[in-house]
């Protein structure tokens, strides 16, 4: 639970201008698009949660799909704005990121660029639509296990917050040159797949 709080705080710090603008003017096109994106995400998450679907066997596939999306979208140029249709497709992509190994931010940013949305808008939008996801995950965990606070939780929050900020900076640099990360993900995918098929070591 502390991870959700820290991740949300990191996103708020990184996207403070955009989030404050939405708080000041909540009734706007951007809010509507974020809600549209959240809809298919919530539906997929609810199906997986209530049906207790085990997706652990898809870890290798998740790594491979993330690598392919990053590679395919790396050199794409776009000038389009986010439309109703693209918001829903991004939401579907975000929902499918419940699959282990499939990066939520990597897949949503890549899909945005595939849809013709320019790089900076894609990154900003991906971080903004993560806010409802993080809040939803926090509430789900709180309803399941209750909410408690301790000094250990505070220390965990602080550690996760700074780790989250570093991860956000890494993601921003990643999309300048994702090829090294693509090689890393492809190697992970091959390792996990070989393990699942032959070795069963982990």
What is the role of each PLM region?
Residues 1-100, 104-202:
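Multi-pass membrane proteins that catalyze or facilitate reactions on polyprenyl-/lipid-phosphate substrates
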